[in-house]
């Protein structure tokens, strides 16, 4: 895949277009590829997803992307993570955010519940529960 969507290549940090941090999940016979776009130092570092019927593709980017972005979760540099299933049976995405609005590193960790709603085409429309972002505290 290439950076073809406007959200995947914003000019807020000088770098070549970047796509990285892939995770693949298989739900109900469909493969879901979660990926990050933009350089991690870019305030618009974000997470989107694509789907395919095979782990080898071809991958189709979902029009609902990005699902994690500073405009959705309220913190800059929100990207590069992984999906996991919690003890409650729900799916979550763990990812990085910038230290503050003016500092990138050291980055902080966030966890957000995923909301999966199957469409008429059999593909899940994935969003996040932005009201319940988990912010681990370190002493």
Regions found by a protein language model. Give the residues of each.
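Carbohydrate-active catalytic/glycan-binding domains of CAZyme proteins
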Residues: 1-139
